[in-house]
Structures are given as C-alpha cells and as structure tokens.
Swiss-Prot record:
Protein name in the entry: Elongation factor P
Species of the source: Deinococcus geothermalis (strain DSM 11300 / CIP 105573 / AG-3a)
Pathway recorded for this protein: Protein biosynthesis; polypeptide chain elongation
Protein's job: Involved in peptide bond synthesis. Stimulates efficient translation and peptide-bond synthesis on native or reconstituted 70S ribosomes in vitro. Probably functions indirectly by altering the affinity of the ribosome for aminoacyl-tRNA, thus increasing their reactivity as acceptors for peptidyl transferase.
The entry's keywords: Cytoplasm, Elongation factor, Protein biosynthesis
SMART domains given in the database record: EFP, Elong-fact-P_C
HAMAP family membership: EF_P
Sequence similarity: Belongs to the elongation factor P family.
Subcellular location: Cytoplasm
Length: 185
C-alpha cells in the first residue's frame, strides 16, 4: 500500500477493480482542513482516462508490472503472435492491445510487453526502427521552396513524410514515438 502523497507520474496502482497508471498529480493545500491530491489516471486495460481527487491520508494498492522482452513473429487472423525471449512461449495478443504500435512492427521486431501476472497490459517499441519504403513519388528537382517533404508508404503500411531525395526501396530510420522520419539507414 502507498499513500496518495507518494504518487508520481508512471506509478501503477489497483483501484476500483482495475489497473491504473498515474499520468498527472498535484498536491493542494487547503486553508482549512487537510490537503488534497488531484490526479489523472489511465486505465491500463481500456485506455480510458479519469480525474480523481483524494484526501491526503488515503492509501492505494500499488502493483508490480514486469517488462518482458518479446519478439513479434506473425499475424494469426486478427491476433498478433509474440514469442517470449526467455521461455520461447508464444503469446497471442489482440489488436486492441497492440494498437498504433502495429504501424511500425515488422516480423522479428523486439518489443517490451508490460505484464501483470499473466496479463499483457501494453507494448513498447524501440525508440527507432529501420523500415523500407515501398511506395513514394519521385522528387522533382527545384520543388524545394518549402523545405521539401513528400509522403512515403513503409513496408508496414504506415505513411511518413520524408525529404524529396529519398527514393522508393530505401531503408529509413523512423522514430516510433512521433512517427517521424529521422534519417536514411
């Protein structure tokens, strides 16, 4: 158990029958009466966000979330299949859990899966991945008045803005947090 005054960004707790991650917190001192802690929590299973206010003496049940290294193998129907890098067990995860990370995952990509017991909560990609451009228009010489970018479709289906000199078939580095082109690989 932890006191609500010990909450920090990223603290994971169990409350109201669900698993929650603290996104924001602030400690308010009142003129009369006790202090209050105003928080914003994200449900780790559904993704919903809730604002909660606690009295300073309240306690919450903290949880331990383990990060497991896994490798993305393939898609099986709607599910994504990952392999645990330690035990080599295969785990099927639904598209709702994988979410937008699928845009930058190709086969054999290593990811970190946040696990609580046997339940997968979220997937974290490496900060940068190298992907091949499968479709982009050729850059036109002299068309660089505004800095010059064009859309390019990656091998995973994601579309990123790349400089005009980048051609189809080129391997590029992409930041998975922002979805932006970084450099040629």
């Amino acid at each position: 158990m932890i006191s609500v005054t010990e909450l920090r960004n990223g603290t994971k707790v169990e409350m109201d029958g669900g698993l929650w991650e603290c996104l924001e917190y602030s400690h308010l001192k009142m003129g009369r009466g006790g202090a209050k802690v105003v928080t914003k929590f994200r449900n780790m299973e559904t993704g919903s966000i809730v604002d909660r206010t606690f009295n300073s003496g309240e306690k919450l049940q903290d949880i331990y979330v383990e990060g497991k290294k896994m490798q993305y193998l393939y898609r099986d129907g709607d599910d994504y299949v990952f392999m645990d890098m330690e035990t080599f067990d295969q785990v099927h995860l639904p598209p709702a859990l994988v979410g937008d990370t699928a845009k930058f995952m190709k086969e054999n990509t290593e990811v970190e899966v946040a696990m609580y017991g046997d339940k997968a909560l979220s997937i974290t990609l490496p900060n940068q991945v190298i992907l091949k451009i499968v479709q982009t228009d050729p850059g036109v010489r002299g068309d660089t008045v505004s800095g010059g970018t064009k859309p390019a479709t990656l091998e995973t289906g994601a579309v990123v803005q790349v400089p005009l000199f980048v051609e189809q078939g080129t391997d590029v580095k992409v930041d998975t947090r922002t979805g932006q082109y970084l450099s040629r690989a």
